[in-house]
C-alpha cells in the first residue's frame, strides 16, 4: 500500500514538472498552428519556428483560394465546335 502511494505521488509530481510537449508549442500568437519537427497528416508548414521546427497548421484553418468560376458550359461549347469542324472536313473529303 505504501508503494502504491509512493508511485502515485511520484506520478503527480512528474506531471507538474515535465511539460506536455507532444503537441508542440504554439506558433506566433495569431497563427492557429504548432511548432513541430514533422507536420502531421492533414497539416502543412507555413514557416519555420526555429532552425529545426516548422509551424504546422491544419488545412481546415487555411483560407480557401479564390478561383475564377467558369461561366456556363464554356468547355463543352468549345468541344462541340471542334466536332463540327471534324464533320465538315470528313464531308469535304468524301465529296
Curated annotation (Swiss-Prot):
Localization per record: Secreted
InterPro entries referenced in this protein's UniProt entry, alphabetically: Beta-defensin, Beta_defensin_dom
Major place of residence: secreted
GO BP: any one term: defense response to Gram-negative bacterium
Record-level GO cellular component terms: extracellular region
Signal peptide boundaries: 1-22
Pfam families according to UniProt: Defensin_beta_2 (PF13841)
Physiological role: Has antibacterial activity.
Family membership: Belongs to the beta-defensin family.
Identification of the protein by name: Beta-defensin 132
